[in-house]
Amino acid sequence: MKAIRKVQKEKTEWQNIQIISFGIAGADEVFLEKIVELGGWDLLDGIALHPGRGNFTPDFPVIAPWEDFKKPAFGYQYWNYYGSIRVVKNFIQKHGGDKDLYLTEIYALDYPNHSWNDTPREAAENLLLSYALAAAEGVKNALYYQLFNSVWFDHLGVNATNREYFFGMINRDLSFKPSLMAFCNTAEVLDKAVFKGWIRMDEKHPLSRGILFD
């Protein structure tokens, strides 16, 4: 990256080219610290995160998003969506706060009959919540994985025993999943939306909250 930055100085238009990290799988703070230690941090314009998610909603484990978030001491500390975003955002702030955050792999796969994945209905709901949370956190870009079922090395292939074939929003027979409808509606509703804050419910429901956009 040092060589690239040196070349960029040769032409003004090249200096506008942004360099972001490759997709870091989960909020791997140890790896991020290593980037800082080896001098790579100051050469990056942004951090790319694959937040990942298991069999819980995207807002897990952030209970009160209006408060500072600390990684839980036990349970699923790592492979969660919103928790990972908050951890990496905190890391960016700790090291200067001058890096954009990119989510390069949001997903809501619906591999059937498996406790670690969503049902088709859950996938639609969780896709919407994933993007709403990303918008609330000021994420620069959030890319969904992926449009069609199947995998890159078996285009339009079918494998009922491999969960990697079920990340798409469109089935192999080209029928639409509920998640595609959710994606279209989310894109329309959040287009140019500005995050205004968290809606806190009454004292009887302290864990209930909403997200306000304008």
Per-range role (PLM):
Residues 131-214:
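Aromatic- and carboxylate-lined catalytic core of secreted/periplasmic carbohydrate-active enzymes
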Residues 1-130, 137:
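Noncatalytic carbohydrate-binding groove/subsite architecture in carbohydrate-active enzymes
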